[in-house]
Every structure is written in structure tokens, then in C-alpha cells.
Regions:
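Gly/Pro-rich active-site loop or hairpin
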Residues: 124, 164-168, 172, 194-265, ...
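Acidic (Asp/Glu)-rich catalytic clusters
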Residues: 5-8, 29-36, 54-74, 101-109, ...
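Active-site acidic/histidine proton-transfer and metal-coordination neighborhood
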Residues: 67, 83-185
């Protein structure tokens, strides 16, 4: 079925792009080389706590180009952020880091900021960690009062260690802890959800998983998809991305992904191995699965 003929809003396909040297000059040049219809960027070192100011010229050029070409843009917040940490310093740094990503997201015209849902460290109960999530994350969500503020998109993890959110139903308590805030959304990573134990293969694997997600968080909350194949088998709890169709998920579930009602118009971002050539091939592969 050609989705464009069925009147369904098409899924823009793109990738995470490098921006060192210039958000617009480097990031969007790379995106164009991928023939990307959507982009994701870091606005800080993903493995650090630094909160650098933007370059206003690059910000403006990036925002204007994305607007002119109808390219939805997203920010991925740093990996170190964990509101469930038992270390006070980590929680405080997480607040500052995420506040920075949200502010930078607004400055560059991003539609959403993706953050990992974190884990309950120090052997503590999940409920204790979720109380902490509420205490520190809810005020940040309440600060998102401008028309051009990005959504905060929660990305579940592959289920390693004391993960707060890895299966679809784990989003329930997480959303509850945050009063199902209107600025809250979900970023579904296909590799993570597969690694956490949701089998996306077979004729209905992907659709069943998406049904479960919608049952948990409600309609309209799925705002972004990280389209990644998996190097490991289902339920392996390992976060190792693979190129589309090459891993244990395979091509068919990605085709199925783009026919589910919950994903209509939702952008797909690849975070796969292989540098620019591998990325361009993955973008092309997903577009073919979408359009044929």
C-alpha cells in the first residue's frame, strides 16, 4: 500500500546528525547528504555536564532552514541525566542539563527534546526513584509555557540494571508521577523496546507493541521514533543498534511500524552504525519501506 495514496500523513525519515563546527553549516549539510526529512542533534556533549551557549547565527540559520524546508528538528539531551539517581549531585546536574537542552531546543526551533528515563540507583525502590523524578522533573515541565517550547520526550531504555522504564507498561507509572503533563510525550526506540523484551517480529509483533504503548499512555503521545535495528536477540537487555534490516528485528517490522494509526506523521530518526554512507543507506531503506 502506498501510504501517500491512503491519505495517511507520511512519516518523515531522517537521522541524528553531527553538529561540531556548526549546527547549520555542518549539521544540515550532513542531513542533506542523507536526504533526511527530519533531524536530531546534540546541543551539548552527550557524555558530559557542560551547558554551552549556542551560536546565534548558526541557531537562526538552522531554525530558518528547518522551517523553510519543513524539516522537523529534535534535540537529544545528554546521556548522564538521571532523575532517579541516589546521588544528589547527579540529580542537581540532571536538572541543569535538561533545562539547558530544553532552552536550546526552543532557541533552534526543535519540536521535542529526548531524554532517557533513567534508573533507580543505589539499590532503591522504583517508587522512591519515581518520587524523585516527580519532584525534579515536574517543575521543568511547568516551565514550558511558551508557544515555541519543545515537548519533553521520554525514551525508554533496553532494560539494563534498575531501569525505571523499559517495557511499554513502565510508561504508566512514569506518566502518573508527572501528572500526564501536557508537554510530555514518548520517543520509541525500536532497538531498546526489542531488547527490553517486546518481540517486534512476525505478522503482528510491531502492531501489538504499539497497541500496548497507546493503551498505557493514550493517543497522541507518541511524538518521535528512533528507528534502529538490534545486534542482539529480543529480550537481551543490550543497547546495541544495527543498520535497518541487518539485525534481529529485520525489515518487515519497520514497514509495519509505518502502517499503525499511532505512528501517522510521526518522524523516524535513525541512530545506526556506519558513518554517512551507512546512514544514507538506512534513510533510503526506510523511505522505500514507507513508499512501496
Amino acid at each position: 500500500v502506498n501510504n501517500q495514496l491512503s491519505g495517511r500523513p507520511r512519516n518523515p525519515v531522517g537521522g541524528h546528525v553531527p553538529v561540531a563546527g556548526g549546527l547549520h553549516s555542518v549539521g544540515l549539510t550532513y542531513a542533506r547528504d542523507l536526504k533526511a526529512e527530519t533531524v536530531q542533534v546534540f546541543v551539548a556533549n552527550p557524555r558530559g555536564w557542560a551547558t554551552p551557549a549556542g551560536n546565534p547565527k548558526q541557531d537562526e540559520a538552522f531554525r530558518a532552514a528547518c522551517e523553510a524546508e519543513s524539516i522537523p528538528a529534535y534535540v537529544h539531551a545528554p546521556y548522564l541525566i538521571n532523575f532517579g539517581s541516589h546521588t544528589e549531585a547527579t540529580v542537581e546536574r540532571s536538572v541543569e542539563s535538561l533545562r539547558h537542552s530544553l532552552r536550546r531546543g526552543r532557541e533552534i526551533g526543535a519540536l521535542g527534546v529526548v531524554v532517557h528515563t533513567g534508573s533507580a540507583t543505589g539499590g532503591r525502590e522504583r517508587s522512591v526513584a519515581l518520587k524523585q523524578v516527580r519532584e525534579h522533573l515536574l517543575p521543568l515541565l511547568d516551565e514550558l509555557t511558551h508557544d515555541d517550547d519543545p515537548y519533553l520526550l521520554l525514551e525508554s531504555t533496553a532494560g539494563q540494571g534498575a531501569s525505571l522504564c523499559s517495557r511499554t507498561w513502565d510508561f504508566g507509572p512514569y506518566f502518573e508521577a508527572l501528572d500526564a503533563h501536557p508537554m510530555l510525550g514518548v520517543c520509541l526506540d525500536t532497538c531498546h523496546i526489542f531488547a527490553a523484551g517486546h518481540d517486534l517480529t512476525g505478522p503482528s509483533g510491531m502492531h501489538q507493541t504499539l497497541d500496548l504503548l497507546v493503551d498505557t499512555v493514550g493517543e497522541g503521545r507518541l511524538k518521535l521514533i528512533h528507528a534502529n535495528d538490534s545486534k542482539d536477540v529480543v529480550g537481551a537487555h543490550k543497547d546495541r543498534h544495527e543498520n535497518i534490516g541487518v539485525g534481529h528485528i529485520g525489515e518487515d517490522p519497520f514497514r509495519a511500524l509505518m502502517t499503525h494509526p499511532a505512528t501517522a506523521g510521526v518522524p523516524l530518526i535513525i541512530e545506526t552504525p556506519g558513518g554517512k554512507e551507512g546512514h544514507a543507506a538506512d534513510v533510503e531503506r526506510l523511505k522505500k519501506l514507507r513508499d512501496c
